[in-house]
């Protein structure tokens, strides 16, 4: 039909996306296409506090796309804001109310497990805090020896035994190892393995000052510092990290993307209702 119309709204993604081609036609003067561009700053009804919260939660390509509204490639360092002086601690920032853990399984590749302390803010009144307290990391290329699933299971049981671990998340594809963990009495939970969403959530938590790493986690720190976007895949429209030296950081991503922290909020009933109304659609609230 010559009078058919289509209306669409979206956040920008990679610049070779088909929708970007339609927008380019509008910019070039094709009267069959019309573009309206708005950013969060154009909305007069959004409080400045909310805008600042979103700015603080975004970094790199996520900030450029989701806040500035730019069509850009995912390139460079993923944790481009990472600073050892800020994000690496000698001791936990709070007392752990409980722990979670996550595993990135590897046989010929490194096997990584991270132990994460969680504070909901109940005792600190400072909101949630998460920190990677310890890491288990076995690299068969370095040790020149692989391990069986039963050996890994024994190691993980000993690694986690001293702690109040509420949940253990694992790569969903590690079926045989999950069965071995079940055999030794440990229940595992399939992790959310949506890579881009997991990266964005992990970056956001660290950017907002909710997520830290203790200095003893040498492998994780090294991986965070060298975790980069795959430029060749980005040019083809695929937002993916380089699959190299990413085992501990993948385990961290599993935990952050899957576990929901119930933040302690000691408000009165009316204050809770007001907070709910203010934040009903605020997906970036702490």
Sequence positions of predicted segments:
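ASCE P-loop NTPase helicase motor core
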Residues: 1-58
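A residue-level signal for conserved active-site and pocket-lining positions in enzyme catalytic cores
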Residues: 9, 38, 67, 104, ...
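ATPase catalytic-site recognition across NTP-hydrolyzing enzymes
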Residues: 44-105
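Short, glycine/acidic-enriched loop or turn micro-motifs at the edges of active sites
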Residues: 107-108, 174
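Short beta-strand scaffold segments in enzyme catalytic cores
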Residues: 110-117, 253
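Short loop/turn segments immediately following beta-strands, especially the blade-tip
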Residues: 117-123
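Mg2+-dependent endonuclease catalytic cores in nucleic-acid-processing enzymes, primarily RNase H-like
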Residues: 125-243, 262-266, 275-286
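Short, hydrophobic alpha-helical segments
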Residues: 255-263
């Amino acid at each position: 039909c010559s009078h058919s119309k289509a209306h669409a709204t979206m956040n920008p993604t990679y610049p070779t996306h088909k929708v970007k081609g339609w927008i380019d036609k509008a910019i070039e003067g094709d009267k069959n296409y019309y573009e309206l561009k708005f950013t969060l700053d154009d909305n007069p009804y959004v409080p400045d506090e909310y805008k600042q919260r979103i700015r603080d939660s975004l970094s790199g390509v996520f900030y450029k796309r989701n806040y500035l509204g730019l069509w850009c490639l995912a390139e460079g360092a993923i944790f481009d804001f990472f600073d050892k002086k800020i994000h690496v601690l000698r001791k936990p920032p709070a007392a752990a109310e409980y722990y979670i853990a996550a595993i990135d399984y590897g046989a010929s590749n490194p096997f990584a497990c991270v132990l994460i302390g969680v504070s909901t803010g109940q005792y600190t009144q400072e909101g949630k805090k998460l920190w990677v307290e310890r890491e288990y990391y076995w690299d068969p290329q370095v040790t020149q020896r692989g391990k069986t699933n039963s050996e890994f299971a024994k190691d993980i049981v000993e690694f986690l035994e001293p702690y109040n671990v509420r949940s253990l998340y694992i790569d969903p594809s590690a079926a045989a190892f999950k069965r071995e963990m079940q055999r030794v009495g440990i229940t595992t939970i399939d992790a959310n393995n949506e890579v881009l969403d997991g990266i964005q959530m992990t970056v956001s938590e660290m950017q907002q000052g909710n997520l830290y790493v203790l200095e003893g986690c040498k492998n994780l720190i090294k991986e965070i510092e060298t975790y980069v976007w795959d430029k060749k895949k980005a040019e083809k429209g695929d937002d993916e990290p380089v699959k190299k030296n990413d085992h501990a950081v993948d385990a961290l991503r599993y935990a952050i993307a899957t576990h929901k922290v119930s933040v302690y909020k000691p408000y009165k009933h009316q204050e809770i209702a007001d907070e709910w109304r203010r934040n009903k659609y605020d997906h970036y609230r702490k």
